[in-house]
Amino acid sequence: MTDKKIFIAVVGESHASPEIAKLAEEVGAEIAKAGAVLVCGGLKGVMEATSKGAKSAGGTTIGILPGSRREDANPYIDFPIITGIGYARNKLVVKTGHVVIAVGGSHGTLSEIAFALGYKIPVVGLKTWQFIHHNGQMDQEVHRASSPKEAVALAMKLAREAKPPEETREYKT
């Protein structure tokens, strides 16, 4: 990783509970305090809460939208990127990040975690999906965090240690 800005993609459910929304907002604030750029899907739920937190701490936010209208972005997005490709944009959210933080999550979040793991992009999980291999062993690829501060600190560490993006962006099965 170079001295350039670190981009942290945050993924999570679009209908977040108050508990998950609070965690997401704290994650956003920690991302801004760390000097990283927040990348998300730009809509509601975890995406909006994280963006709100980042903006409250003076951060920069990028929202990669599934539709074709900038107006659909939540009010805390600085740079709405319209795609018109629906939820296929989940790949773009993940690939834009040097690291992914999953906060809570539903099935869309599950797809984003899977894309990140396939692209060898580090994933930090905060109250999100857990994976068990067919042999019954717990998967160790998703790094677990117990707080927003720990999640962002771990994400920053993993991003700095990660291989350059050009070496990790081909999907591996």
Model-derived segments and their meaning:
Residues 1-62:
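Glycine-rich beta-alpha loop segments
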Residues 41, 83, 102-104:
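Thr-Gly-centered strand-to-loop micro-motif
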Residues 43-44, 66-69, 128-131:
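Short, ordered loop/turn segments at secondary-structure junctions
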Residues 60-65, 123-127:
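Short, hydrophobic beta-strand segments that form beta-sheet elements in well-ordered domains
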Residues 2-6, 11-15, 87-159:
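C-terminal binding/interaction regions
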